[in-house]
From Swiss-Prot:
One of its GO terms (biological process) is positive regulation of dendritic spine development. The modification Phosphotyrosine is found at Y628. This is Mitogen-activated protein kinase 6. ATP binds at L26, G27, C28, G29, G30, N31, G32, L33, V34, K49. GO terms for molecular function: ATP binding; MAP kinase activity; protein heterodimerization activity; protein kinase binding; protein serine kinase activity; protein serine/threonine kinase activity. The lineage of its organism: Eukaryota, Metazoa, Chordata, Craniata, Vertebrata.
Amino acid sequence: MAEKFESLMNIHGFDLGSRYMDLKPLGCGGNGLVFSAVDNDCDKRVAVKKIVLTDPQSVKHALREIKIIRRLDHDNIVKVFEILGPSGSQLTDDVGSLTELNCVYIVQEYMETDLANLLEQGPLLEDHARLFMYQLLRGLKYIHSANVLHRDLKPANLFINTEDLVLKIGDFGLARIMDPHYSHKGHLSEGLVTKWYRSPRLLLSPNNYTKAIDMWAAGCIFAEMLTGKTLFAGAHELEQMQLILESIPVVHEEDRQELLNVIPVYIRNDMTEPHKPLTQLLPGISPEALDFLEQILTFSPMDRLTAEEALSHPYMSIYSFPTDEPISSHPFHIEDEVDDILLMDESHSHIYNWERYHESQFSDHDWPIHNNYEADEVQRDPRALSDVTDEEEVQVDPRKYLDGDREKYLEDPAFDTHFSTEPCWQYSDHHENKYCDLECSHTCNYKMRSSSYLDNLVWRDSEVNHYYEPKLIIDLSNWKEQSKEKSDKKGKSKCEKNGLVKAQIALEEASQQLVEKEREKNQGFDFDSFIAETIQLSLQHEPTDVDKLNDLNSSVSQMESKGLISKSVSREKQEKGMANLAQLGALYQTSWESQFVSNGEECFLIDQFCCEVRKDEQVEKENTYTSYLDKFFSKKEDAEMLEPEPVEEGKLGEKERGESFLSNSGELFFNKQLEAIGIPQFHSPVGSPLKSIQATLTPSAMKSSPQIPHKTYSSILKHLN
């Protein structure tokens, strides 16, 4: 882990100190590199964005992004937890200190995936696309009410948790403040929005645009969710405009004249009927969805639906709920844009502090808007005057001007007058609480102790989330099947779902060790050892009959020691064998010739013992358990043993001479231990089975058999010699 962290530091210069671990690259944002990491203070995985400060322009963009994201607080916007300096240090309140740093880190909410990754698996169902589009419009309504333009909406900047299908807008690196009271013509940056999601107005006039550019991008994203591919994918700006003109009608004559001045080659006399309308580009789309999309993808920004109007469209009626679509309580104004300009001058940069950007210090009554100019001389955005003309009615949140607004909320016993209205995560202590306050409590839906939160607290406790549809979560399987299977998290809080990463890793390792121990304990057959022993046996020479008997006796003794066969059978066999061999040993005191002439009584005893051994072997074969040695030897070609027929003692010798080594089929077979003793031709040097058996009776072979004592073999060899 330490080596991996050092490599990330060396390659990317990503240094957060020892507080963050398990860094993994996620991608690049609008102006920085993004990693995921685990915060050791609360065991929670977060996303960390690094912004490099190399020149005054980068400092201005970083300050603008930090200023915007710290004030925005909405369910469909990625939450920001804190801003850190190099090595994870805390930033001071002085904004001027930002110019002295080489980088800053934005610690924000970690999301499972983004819409671009989801669309790589194919198009979405229309129900899923409508749900995601509703949440996108819900977030845009809040962003635009704060007088902010995102300017970089695309699937890669829309983050999704597939468990609950929550979509959140992220990456405000290219966002900017735009007060609708003033015209920003000629003062806006150009070429910011990704080319495929640029509106026609942005292509014609890169320095003059409004909030409508975000709505055009939202419409292109909605069409991409339905088809799985980019709606207008031009290789350059001219081709991008050509693709738009082939599908989007140009209704107004002034727009056609403007196009005629810029690109006269592609302009026709009648452009109200496009060659490839949206019905051809989006086959199979419902009529309601097509009407909804046609009102968003309009050539003129004045005809385009706003976010609030799109939420009221009949296509969104199943999700629309105006009470649960909040707007910003503290929108940005022109003074916040002036701050960006003043920050470029070092003589003014140290007089502005961070506290200025937490809450706006000036209202519209305090700010001298028209001190030096008449009302008619001030240029305004035409979209701001489309519906209303009164200056105060343009303000989005009318509650800002109500008298006694704060005092009526102090009557709530749950409201503590000594509690600061600032977000709790601004302070270095109580660091662990910032995640729970933003993720687990009911206050995460709105800004803490704001008027919108207090008004909606009662009905939010009783109402379910109206746009949450479990059936859609079940249907979203094409992405889930290709992602790793997750553990069941039903019944857990969000902290338990998102936190305790180290504890989960330790639990998984402990469970794996427990499974391995149980596997070793319950192991009944070691396949590896079986293969090794089988190979070893195959490399040895072919065992003789006596070796087979010794191995068989060894296997029987092992089975007996493990309790796999009954001890009474083995004991009975051993007692009979010892008794017969004891009688045989008593007869060995006489000469070999006398033993042979005595009507074969000793041979009969030995044959009887061998027959009993064969019967025991037959019992072992019928047993359910068979060792791999028994199976190995059973494959050898062994002649079938014959049971001795009861004959008279006088005829025993002659019968043994003719039939002791013959089976029913006439094949010669060997007694596994001592039947060769009864052969009268043992003195013959050629073809004598006695000599072959005598050669195999080595001391090692005798000692390997636990059933027959070594003393008996010694006495037999003595007489044989």
